[in-house]
């Protein structure tokens, strides 16, 4: 409920306006029926005056005008609440603990957010607000006006409510099981769809698409079949209510004919008021069923929103030192049962150019993520300058660190946005930097130039172009520590050599840490650190290691082959 309360508070004024309008409109709708009784009886006994007709006309005018005005807060809240829940998910991603984020599959997460946002909107808007401003006031006013006409009919009404309650509980049991199956099938379907979209080449070349499409079709059939069943049960509610109202309508006509106690106007009013009294009950049962089902989707969404945050992003000390000087002592890191870094110690001086080299799974990337504060170490000490990493505010740290991963951190936007984000930089400066990374031809050959959209994850660019565009961003960042995690792996040897020469010239006064598998690219680094099974097993210059370290020679020879 915490997040629902948060969104209610955010939209507080419009919620109050919406509830107020709903209660007023419910009263006017029922009062209109009550007054219509007087008009009919006035016509029947020829006592109707012009004032009565004019008053009824005014009531109709108010009713229709207020219903029209009601659309504004209704749509504002309906769409706003849904998007507010989606914004909550984006805010969550911005502060979520990195290890929790790693456990989430993109396809399932997208479906969970989509379903959860819609469910949150339905719980708050379609159920609670509908109940408070529409259903309860309409039932209350209807019963009051029915009681004014004939108390006995009111008692019959309550008997009908009891029948409905029993019927509802029977149907609900079936609906819960069906909805749970739909949720699981939708997440599975989205998992297959996203996997197919993201891994097109892998599945095409391995001829896996027929199998993937078959699995997706099976999930689709389950969803369609379950939704049809659910819809039929929903419609059963309305059919039962329609039959019950029909029985009551006939009963009122029979009662009026037999007792002669009701006027024509009273009969007409009772029939209309009974429909007013029962329609909200029919609606309530349907939205209550949906509410219970939506709670299952919303619970999954809440579980995501409730995942552990990285509190260090906002908490901690402001940095008052150069983070390019690093001291690591007896560092250990364990993920679940696996020890990835074991008693590691390392010192890096300000401005030093360091390369991490080793087999896959030797701990290089894990150490990088620890230095970035993404992973929290179990034992040991990591000092940036003269400050312990655990005590630093990470948002403050990220102002001083540049990080480029192997996956080329470019995003769906323009070339300009990928270069400078929202910074104000002249076009000449940007073009100059693109020349440094051998990308000027890209802009010159495009009609939109720097404003060209590069597509999701840079799909309009080659792997090497994406990496060069990401590297160009370094020219516009005022960092003290630069970390490159195989940031040139998609480039050819000649391009990599020329681009890295420009990058290292630009970074000459900064500390640079690079992970590399292509060892010739780090030949000019001050020091190379060798990793194996979570430990440092050697270090030195490229030439020293090439002639004295058998492990490095094995890595180099394997790389050359």
Locate each region found by the language model.
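An intracellular "coupling" helix at the cytosolic face of ABC transporter transmembrane type-1 domains
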Residues: 98-99, 115-128, 132, 136, ...
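A hydrophobic transmembrane-helix motif
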Residues: 27-37, 128-172, 228-271
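Cytosolic ends of transmembrane helices, especially the final helix of ABC transmembrane type-1 domains
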Residues: 208, 232, 276-306
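A short amphipathic helical element positioned immediately N-terminal to and/or at the very start
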Residues: 1-10, 109
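Transmembrane helix-loop-helix hairpins at lipid-water interfaces of multipass membrane proteins
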Residues: 12-69, 73, 146-154, 264
């Amino acid at each position: 409920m915490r997040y629902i309360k948060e969104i209610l508070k955010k939209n507080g004024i419009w919620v109050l306006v919406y509830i107020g309008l709903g209660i007023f409109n419910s009263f006017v709708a029922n009062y209109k029926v009550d007054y219509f009784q007087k008009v009919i009886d006035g016509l029947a006994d020829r006592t109707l005056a012009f004032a009565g007709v004019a008053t009824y006309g005014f009531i109709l005018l108010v009713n229709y005008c207020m219903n029209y005005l009601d659309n504004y807060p209704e749509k504002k809240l309906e769409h706003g609440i849904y998007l507010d829940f989606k914004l909550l998910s984006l805010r969550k991603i911005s502060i979520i603990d990195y290890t929790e984020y790693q456990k989430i599959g993109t396809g399932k997460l997208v479906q969970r957010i989509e379903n959860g946002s819609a469910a949150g909107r339905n719980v708050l808007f379609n159920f609670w607000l509908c109940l408070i401003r529409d259903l309860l006031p309409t039932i209350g006013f209807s019963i009051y006006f029915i009681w004014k006409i004939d108390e006995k009919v009111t008692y019959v009404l309550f008997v009908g409510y009891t029948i409905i309650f029993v019927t509802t509980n029977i149907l609900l049991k079936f609906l819960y099981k069906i909805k749970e199956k739909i949720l699981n099938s939708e997440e599975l379907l989205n998992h297959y769809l996203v996997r197919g979209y993201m891994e097109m080449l892998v599945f095409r070349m391995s001829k896996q698409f027929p199998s993937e499409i078959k699995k997706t079709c099976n999930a689709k059939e389950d969803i369609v079949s379950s939704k049809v069943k659910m819809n039929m049960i929903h419609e059963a509610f309305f059919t039962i209510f329609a039959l019950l109202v029909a029985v009551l309508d006939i009963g009122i006509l029979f009662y009026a004919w037999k007792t002669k106690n009701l006027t024509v106007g009273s009969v007409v009013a009772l029939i209309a008021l009974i429909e007013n009294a029962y329609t909200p009950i029919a609606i309530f049962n349907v939205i209550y069923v949906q509410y219970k089902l939506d709670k299952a989707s919303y619970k999954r969404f809440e579980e995501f929103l409730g995942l552990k945050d990285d509190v260090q992003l906002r908490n901690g000390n402001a940095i008052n030192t150069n983070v390019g000087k690093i001291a690591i002592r007896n560092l250990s890191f364990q993920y679940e049962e696996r020890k990835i870094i074991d008693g590691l110690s390392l010192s890096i001086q300000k401005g030093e150019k360091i390369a991490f080299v080793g087999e896959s799974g030797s701990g290089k990337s894990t150490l990088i993520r620890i230095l970035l504060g993404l992973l929290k170490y179990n034992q040991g000490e990591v000092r940036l300058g003269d400050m312990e990493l655990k005590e630093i505010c990470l948002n403050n740290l990220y102002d001083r660190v540049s990080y480029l991963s192997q996956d080329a951190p470019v995003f769906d936007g323009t070339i300009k946005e990928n270069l400078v984000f929202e910074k104000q930089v002249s076009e000449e400066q940007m073009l100059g930097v693109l020349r440094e990374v051998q990308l000027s031809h890209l802009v010159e050959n495009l009609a939109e130039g720097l404003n060209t959209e590069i597509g999701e994850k840079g799909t309009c660019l080659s792997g090497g172009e994406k990496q060069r565009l990401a590297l160009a961003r370094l020219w516009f960042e005022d960092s003290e520590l630069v970390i490159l995690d195989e940031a040139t792996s998609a480039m050819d040897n000649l391009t990599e050599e020329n681009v890295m020469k420009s990058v290292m010239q630009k970074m000459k006064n900064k500390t640079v840490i690079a992970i590399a598998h292509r060892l010739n690219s780090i030949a000019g680094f001050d020091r190379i650190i060798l990793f194996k099974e979570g430990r440092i097993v050697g270090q030195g210059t490229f030439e020293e290691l090439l002639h004295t370290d058998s492990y490095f020679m094995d890595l180099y020879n394997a790389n050359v082959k």
